[in-house]
Curated annotation (Swiss-Prot):
EC number: 3.5.4.13
Lineage: Bacteria, Pseudomonadati, Pseudomonadota, Alphaproteobacteria, Rickettsiales
Name of the protein: dCTP deaminase
Residue sites binding dCTP per the record: K111, S112, T113, Y114, A115, R116, T135, L136, E137, Q156, Y170, K179, Q180
Organism: Rickettsia felis (strain ATCC VR-1525 / URRWXCal2)
GO molecular function terms noted in the UniProt entry: dCTP deaminase activity; nucleotide binding
Active site, renumbered: E137
Pfam families: DCD
Alphabetic keyword roster: Hydrolase, Nucleotide metabolism, Nucleotide-binding
Domain of life assignment: Bacteria
Length: 188
């Protein structure tokens, strides 16, 4: 597998609609204000987080169970700045909709701007032929409240192209998160 360059990413966007909407260059300023960057980079794509968040809460005294997940574990917010409580967690989603080619696996890494503040972004790999908005997991590892800025960069996606086509893609096996929109909760 090889990591793919900005040139390849642009071609995949043009020919296969791999990322929509797509920023062809790094965007660092919006309305004359500095922002956390997003857009195409040398060997990846920095995606933005939307203003749709689900923040973990303890007010309902529920238990987090991945096999039987309760929406009562979360509070919904549509905000420009999401404040994650100390040592807590929030879910968001990308503004961008991804459509992954059959011979590509995508991994996600966090942005150093957030990591240096104790905010970790986690995303599982985007498998061949998966498509949808990516649900982002934000963990505030600090003892202080932390801010996540909607409509700004949140993470970077790296595209790994295989020299072989997989026998079974995510679409072939009808994966449960296929074509997800919005923040998607755990499914079993």
């Amino acid at each position: 597998m090889a990591i793919m360059s900005d040139k390849w990413i642009k071609e995949a966007v043009i020919n296969q609609s791999m990322i929509r909407p797509f920023a062809e260059k790094q965007v660092r300023v919006h309305n004359k204000e500095k922002i956390i960057s997003y857009g195409l980079s040398s060997y990846g794509y920095d995606a933005r987080v939307s203003n749709e968040f689900k923040i973990f809460t303890n007010i309902n005294s529920t238990t987090v169970d991945p096999k039987n997940f309760s929406e009562y574990n979360l509070v919904d917010r549509e905000v420009d700045v999401c404040i994650i409580p100390p040592n807590s967690f929030a879910l968001g989603r990308t503004i961008e909709y991804f459509k992954i080619p059959r011979d590509v696996l995508v991994i996600c890494v966090g942005k150093s701007t957030y990591a240096r503040c104790g905010i970790i972004v986690n995303v599982t790999p985007l498998e061949p032929e998966w498509e949808g908005h990516v649900t982002l997991e934000f963990s505030n590892t600090t003892p202080l409240p932390a801010k996540i800025y909607a409509n700004e960069g949140a993470c970077q996606f790296l595209f790994l192209k295989s020299d072989q086509i997989c026998d079974t893609s995510y679409a072939d096996r009808q994966g449960k998160y296929m074509k997800q929109v919005g923040v998607t909760l755990p499914l079993t």
